[in-house]
Structures are given as structure tokens and as C-alpha cells.
Amino acid sequence: MNNKIISMFVLWVFFTLWNGVTLQAQAPHPERIYLSGTGIDDTRTWDFFCSAGQNSGKWKKIEVPCNWELQGFGEYTYGRWYTVKGQRPSDETGIYRYKFDVPKSWAGQRVKIFFDGVMTDAEIIINGKPAGELHQGGFYRFSYDITELLNLGKKNQLEVKVAKESANRSINAAERKADWWLFGGIYRPVWLEVLPQIHMKHFVLSADHKGKFQASIDMEGDAKGHEIVVSVRSLKDGKTVYTSNGQTTITHPINNSGKEQMISGEWTNIVPWSTEAPNLYVVKLELKNPEGKIVQTRETRIGFRTVEFFPQDGVYLNGTKLVIKGINRHSFSVDGGRTTNAALSRMDAQLIKEMNMNAVRSHYPPDEHFLDMCDSLGLVYMDELAGWQNSYDSKVGAKLVKEMIERDVNHPCIILWSNGNEGGWNTQTDPLFAQYDRLQKRHMVHPWADFN
């Protein structure tokens, strides 16, 4: 009996310490107000209706996020269905509903809703009205400004209509004729962000191994008269980093109504990020109004590193040749399908490091927390647009390239972009990678091709 108690205590200590390490490795997001859970171990119950297959034809409860097949809805299909004569993929649709509160204190602010991943076509409806155009593509984050659709001080209803098979043939060819299980549903988190009318919408950062720093910030609203204050601190010990002229901040006054603001400077005594020593820093961006009040704060983790490619020679990281020893990885869990969590990402990244490997690719954009783990543990990453031997058409492909890069652009682990997975590239979308990765302009490759 005593041995059993001791064993249980040891397991409890292990998982407590493991979760603590995982939380430290994962980037925090205090700006998010979650409507779903954050992973397979943290879900919320929504109402759900499935059109066909198991448990169809009636309203039931479902946990979000999670692929609906793993909760007993619809039908399973494997991606090589087309190799069996007469077989068709399951194509059920699902309707999700969830009610949430909108306090009166949100008046005068912008409210945006974010979906981190829905398979495959998603129509978003707020209080009976569409939030925007149909989103297509199962591996990408998308969002809508829903300010004008909300009822302040009341319950509001979110409805999501999801089609497992896309109405776009190129998406089905790129994502759903592949050597993996074909799932449906809201499988990554859903959240709200409440923002001031004038705010920093998106930012792109560049930080080299000598401390040179650039930020390109997209503003929403007329920010003339505002200023942006940038500071950097060490993630490890919280110590403030100083600029080359001895200041703790870089202040950028916004003297025009332009949407893009460029900031540059240099930070001193930087310890570079590498695969052997993945040193991370926290960049804080503060937006101040003309009266000097901070109206918005955004933080993200960065690593100061320089990536260079030389023909017939190879990849250099911070001036030292990097011998890449890589592995492929899928985002998958036995309980959630494509729904995972930060602890699983941590475990996979740790196992890859223990195999003496230093690089990863994973067929499609992974969960963001896996990139966080690569940042924290020192794995370089090739971020890849989905497209298993077939490419997206130019219109939808352009949108999905933008969504992938805007989500992932500031991760130091990413050293390469890949336009398509194992042969699924569209050359018309090639220029967009440098357009959205506008500061670092990392190399983009075509898998299986002698390109770039």
C-alpha cells in the first residue's frame, strides 16, 4: 500500500513539473478571451448538429476543440479513399452553437473573433448575421471583426456551419487526398480579442544575432499623434536590455496616418538564439495615445539570430555552418485527432531533441504551441503550406499563404518557408512569401524540386 502511494506521488510530481516546464515554454496570450478550450485536455461544451453518419439528425453536446469523429459523430475516412474503386469520402456537415456574454464595458472598442483551425469550410454567424465571407482551408488561422454584430450587455450567439469536404476542389485536392485521416470540425481554439478603435493590428519583427532590430507594425485607425514604445527583456531572468545609446526603450512617434509604421534600433549584450542555446527575449510594444496613456500592449517572444544560405555550401546560423538533421512530424492525438495540446507538443519536441535531431517539417502549419516549443528547445523549422501532391488554386492559395505567414512570421525557429507539401506548389503564390515575410524574407522552397 505504501509503495502504491509513493508511486502515485512520484507520478504526480512528474506531471506537475512537466506541466510547469510546458507552461514556461509556451508563449502566453493574455489578450485572448477563449470561447472554446485550449486543447484536448481543456475543452468547453457547445451544442452540435451533425448531418450524417453516427449521432446525426439531432442536436447534441460536443466538446470544443476536437474533431467531431473522435466524439462519435459522422464517419471516418482515410485520405487514400480514391484508391478503392467506387469509394467516396464522407462529406457530412456540422452546425455548432455557443452563447457568450458581451459586457457593456466593451462599448467603443473593436471586438474580433479568431479561429485557429476548422476543417474545412467554415461559415461564421453572429446573432443570425454572417460575420464575413466563407473561410476555406483546414490548417489556418482566420478572424472577423464582429463589433457591429454584437448585443452589449446581453447573451450573444455564435453559430459555425462547417463542411467537412470543401466546396473548393483545389482545397480537397491539396488537403483531403492525402496519406492521413480526414477529419471535420473545430479542432483548434476559438477566442475573442477586445481592442481600442486605434490599435496595432499586426506586427512583423526582425532581430539579428548582433542585436540589430526592426519592426513593421500595421495600424488600424488613424494613429497620427500616437506613439509606439518598444522594450526588450530577457525571458530567462527578466532583465531589461539596453539600446546601443544606453536607453531602455525605443520610442517611435506616429507623425502620419500611414497604416505601416517602421521602427529600427540596436540592442546591446544580446545572447543569440541557436539550436544549442535557444536564448529567448520578450519584445513589448506599447501604443500610447496623444495624452500619453497606454491604450494597447502587445508582447511576443523573439530570438536574435541570423540565417544565411550559400549555394553549394549550405545553411549558416549566426555565422556558423548548421548541419541539418531533420524529421517529419504530424499534429495528432489519439483522443482528439488533429486536436492536441501544449504538453504533447513539448513531449514531441523533447523526443526529437533526444534523438539528436535539430530540424522539423510537418506537412502543413502546426499548432502554434509546437512552434513555441521549437523556439524554446532549439529546433529549426520549415513552415509548410499544405498541398499533398496537389496545390491550392491561386485565389485561395494567396489567402492561405497570408494567413500562415501572419501567424508564424515572428518565430525564431522558422528558417524556411515551403510552398506546398511533397509536390503541391503553385508558382503564382511564390512572390507572396517575401511580401508577407517583409523584413526577414526567409528562403522559400518547392518540396521535391530543384528550386531556390
Could you describe each region identified by the protein language model?
Residues 349-352, 359-452:
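Substrate-binding/catalytic cleft of secreted carbohydrate-active enzymes
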Residues 126, 212-250:
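Beta-strand-rich binding/interaction modules
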Residues 106-109, 150-155, 266-280:
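Short glycine/proline/serine/threonine-rich loop/turn segments at secondary-structure transition edges
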Residues 1-28:
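Bacterial Sec-dependent N-terminal signal peptides
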Residues 32-37, 203-204, 284-352:
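N-terminal carbohydrate-binding accessory modules
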Residues 27-32, 49, 67, 91-202, ...:
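Accessory beta-strand-rich segments of carbohydrate-active enzymes
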Residues 128, 190, 281, 319, ...:
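Conserved, mostly hydrophobic/aromatic
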Residues 16, 24-80, 161-170, 237:
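Accessory carbohydrate-binding/adhesion or oligomerization-edge regions at the termini
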